[in-house]
């Protein structure tokens, strides 16, 4: 087993290697609209949360290795950090078709329903399974405007 990351670059590479999404965590400077991140402020490292342009500092660390250990544990324990959306639509039949495909491929998924003007069905796969289904989002993700 690989040792846990000690630097932002190592944490970023670990996320890539394990197919984590980059939507909710800003590690090593990637842009996010909403979520958690690491920022260096002088000699300190700040763990923050940002939403709608408002950034709130949550924790302060003296060393890079301390904040990386903290971030690594947070990311590892966040089931959403490893999800990839492969379906977003309003058609239950189309959603069921997608679930059947994923089941036949023996791919674990998470499916939920959210109110989005009308009921929208979202389907996610985990981690590196996204590499097995790269063609599915083109067919099963609709524009929210539909």
Functional labels for PLM-detected ranges:
Residues 27-56, 74:
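Short aromatic-glycine-(Arg/Gly/Cys) micro-motifs in beta-strand/loop hairpins
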Residues 1-26, 78, 132-144:
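Negatively charged, low-complexity tracts enriched in Asp/Glu with abundant Ser/Thr
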